[in-house]
Amino acid sequence: MELRHLRYFVTVVEEQSISKAAEKLCIAQPPLSRQIQKLEEELGIQLFERGFRPAKVTEAGMFFYQHAVQILTHTAQASSMAKRIATVSQTLRIGYVSSLLYGLLPEIIYLFRQQNPEIHIELIECGTKDQINALKQGKIDLGFGRLKITDPAIRRIVLHKEQLKLAIHKHHHLNQFAATGVHLSQIIDEPMLLYPVSQKPNFATFIQSLFTELGLVPSKLTEIREIQLALGLVAAGEGVCIVPASAMDIGVKNLLYIPILDDDAYSPISLAVRNMDHSNYIPKILACVQEVFATHHIRPLIE
């Protein structure tokens, strides 16, 4: 049995069709069918139910599929890590969500550069969900994100829980709560601007889930492309916007930022790495996180 046989089988399962899998794998359909039959003969089990369209996996086939996916994932990770170790001049590719640039991430990266001048750093903007795929494919080595996305191949380290704020125009009627804060239930009738409109799940879907978990339904939601535009529209009186506290540093004029008092009104900032990756740059970047947080009197969640 070779890795290509596992890859063929996994593709057929995921495409639910021999013809679609053959097209995706860029091979003819008859040879692919023969390879699947040979795999069944070698294993001594039937992987697919006969006569079903779309292709239906047997119970034994599904068990084998789950393990085949793990084998292919681990093999890809091992290959990626081996290539990196063999590279004389080490390059560290760091994925990040753009909103973190308004917080402490730039200080963390700068400190890491100063302490590790031998490591070349490439910064790659990508959403939290995209970071998971990029990590598994070896396109990035670390990912700084905000969303809680689980994957068996990825280890997620929560660094900090950043408070959420409600951005309003300084003359908005909710300005009376600037010092005391508001609950989400108090703002469901306000025109609400959400960002971004990129691939979901994203920060907008995260905010919507906070309302859903409390049984609340905002009356008017408008999705905006990015945080700067959303805050600019708030300054123009178009509505209100929920943002991480670090967004205050963007510096849009005529805005107030009101604390949101609900228990889960925070945005987790996390570092994502491959489960099999035990490279020394991971503890080094975590040490930089702790050092930068300490200068800002923030207690990190890592030890």
From Swiss-Prot:
Annotated ranges, domain HTH lysR-type: 1-58
Keyword annotations: Activator, Aromatic hydrocarbons catabolism, DNA-binding, Repressor, Transcription, Transcription regulation
Pfam families assigned to the protein according to its UniProt record, in alphabetical order: HTH_1, LysR_substrate
Record InterPro entries: HTH_CatM, LysR_subst-bd, Tscrpt_reg_HTH_LysR, WH-like_DNA-bd_sf, WH_DNA-bd_sf
UniProt record, GO biological process: catabolic process
Domain of life of the native organism: Bacteria
DNA-binding region per UniProt: 18-37
Induction record: Negatively autoregulated.
One MF annotation (Gene Ontology) recorded for this entry: DNA-binding transcription factor activity
GO CC entries: protein-DNA complex
Chain positions recorded as cis,cis-muconate binding sites: 99, 128
Keyword Zinc-finger: no
Subunit structure: Homotetramer in solution.
Entry function: Positively regulates the expression of catA, catBCIJFD and benPK in response to cis,cis-muconate. It binds to the catB-catM intercistronic region, to a specific sequence upstream of catA and to the benPK promoter region. Can also repress pca genes.
Classification via PANTHER family: LYSR FAMILY TRANSCRIPTIONAL REGULATOR (PTHR30346:SF17), TRANSCRIPTIONAL DUAL REGULATOR HCAR-RELATED (PTHR30346)
Family: Belongs to the LysR transcriptional regulatory family.
Name of the protein described by the UniProt record: HTH-type transcriptional regulator CatM
Organism: Acinetobacter baylyi (strain ATCC 33305 / BD413 / ADP1)
